[in-house]
Amino acid sequence: MNTVNKPFRKKDAMQLVTGQPVYMDDLVPADCLIVKLLRSPHANAIVKSINTAVAKKVPGIEAIFTWEDVPQDARRYTQAGQTYPEASPYDRLLIDRHVRFVGDVVAIVAGKDDKCVDKALKMIKVEYEVLEPVLDYHTAKDNPILVHPEDNWESLCPVGGDNKRNLCAHDECGSGDIDAVLADCDVVIDHVYHTKACQQAMMETFRTYCSIDLYGRLNVLSSTQIVFHARRIIANALHIPKSMVRVTKPRIGGGFGAKQTAVCEVYPAFVTWKTRKPSKLIFTREESQIASTPRHEMEIHLRLGANKDGRIRGLDLYTLSNTGAYGEHGPTTVGLSGHKSIPLYSNAEAFRFTYDVVYTNHMSAGAYRGYGATQGLFAVESAVNELAAKLHMDPFKIREMNIVHEGDVMPAYYGAVNTSCTLDRCLAKVHEMINWNEKYPRRDMGNGKIRAVGMGMAMQGSGISGMDVGSATLKVNDEGFYTLLIGAADMGTGCDTTLAQIAAEVLECGLDNITVFGADTDTSPYDSGSYASSTTYITGKAVEKCALKLRSQICKLGAQLLDCSENDVEFDGKTVFTSADPSKSVSLGDIATASMFGHDIPLEVTETHMSPLSPPPYMVGAAGVEVDTETGEVKLLEFDACVDCGTPINPNLTRVQAEGGILQGIGMTLTENVTYDQRGWPMENSLMQYKIPTRVDVGKVRVEFENSYEPNGPFGAKSIGEVVINTPLPAISDAIYNAIGTRFYELPITPEKIAMAVAEKEGAV
């Protein structure tokens, strides 16, 4: 292959590294209205009265909007960017009189500059009827205090939700008699695993600019992963026709799932629609910490049964998920905690997976890389590591005995067949990379320092089977260069580049010969959006189909110009020539020119792709740590990983994706945490309190690939974006156990917890 599986530089690399104006705030006019939000100081309250009269008199203030400007009996909406029919409940109003978490919106203020808006915010007088909040998600279900007591709460899908029970979603599924199987097992690992909420903490905070175009339509420029869903969400929130909304995206400074929710778009959109003046809203870092969409806090009760020889026979998993004040992504993230963890051990005789998603008066949770699988894999893989220790077996060996293989049916993965898999080879590769036999389980280095290793596996999916849609439009321009129009959003992942590589491979041209444009709801073909690990697998396949069809059209017009049958010509990327006589040819440039006059064969093609399958990528990771038993400090000396993502379209970008995801998983394991005080106030409201790891906080990170070939993906590709975050959690946790002999069932594992565990073990506590 000429371009696929080759390490091309990102198409936008030079623009980004030289600081060119490519992000939202670089592109908006300086004289637009500044929009800011007044937020609730209470976790649960009713706005009894709100006085904006004095604030409106501040010079420069254009408008102030409150719940009185939003019909409270109107149909609600969700800010979750999801494919139809939208699993997340319609439980929001643009401004609700009932505020449900600390940071919920009370008023929207718009003015000519920051100074006047900040002054006006301080002058708004609000009287609240403070209500008792639901802050413990263990007691939320069937609690007499309702987070959503309203009657116009609406669930579009049968997800088991009931707002009068504080229940966002509920389901259960299984195969076989799990209770009988577990009763017959020699060993049962039975624990509750707790993963806290954590923030995506992308460099670029939430931001949106809105204006009215010459047709009177609302134009929205937003840092979003989901332009088409954002259009629907804005229209629903403002109760205007979708045809009156256009959404485009600039370059995005990271998202990791946060921007799969329309966190900020509706507020400047409302201001601009009402005032007919351009406006922008840029979240501060504090706002992005206290009023965004962090990962769902989950508690997972897992029972895992096995025989004495290490054969895993059954898994019983119950997940309790805290969706917070609103239900964005609540019904969908929770499913992955079981459906993307249990299938790793599909040879088990039985499984059961049950879950509840509950409302609380915490910040609304949402999408974050891994999307529920991360939490479930921490539980399942930690249990398998504990099983190995209990049976005195090597963690690699016990997995070799039990893992899913290519061709296996996966009952817990909706009964799908595992169409491509090199998980066994990934295990062998990581075993070799970290030099496991020499380092496992621990080495005492003296001076209270112990080095140890641990490992874990992961799987994810490639898009949402039977639902996600990706589309692409390809056209030949004069002189024979191509334009690729996509609806997927490049969030810094390089999807513009990888999709162009797929097209270039089919069309046998150089990568620079393809310009990429996206995403714009007016001009791009429909795409579900850049989430669910779908871009390469779903949109990439649409690009491949589109390029093949365009290639056929080029040959058809070329044959017409050569006065012969289409079956008698070939195309080498530069010319169309007759098979019998290659000297009889016509250049691509001449074909492009001919398409513009006197011919009716179009050189513009649009193709759409939907896959009934979501083939899992797989990953194995191993961590080497050094634990200081006196201070509890953990140094990550190395992390070695091997990924099966099918055919990597661009190995450089694929490796960078893996390295970034691993770092995020390390943070979730050791430092990152979202906590609340007794009033429901978020404690980590800046990056001083919310500790994300930097590159200097970790040692060597090495990533290799064991390529499978996925027959349903473009050139054999599967996804890469999410699976990479999942293995650090069980791997580092097990390494710490091997170092100090104490297992941790709650994340993050902080130095304080480790020091206390060591002291307790030594009898000091």
Regions found by a protein language model. Name each.
Residues 1-160, 274:
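Flexible, low-hydrophobicity surface segments
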Residues 6, 12-15, 82-85, 161-208, ...:
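Glycine-rich loop/linker segments at domain edges
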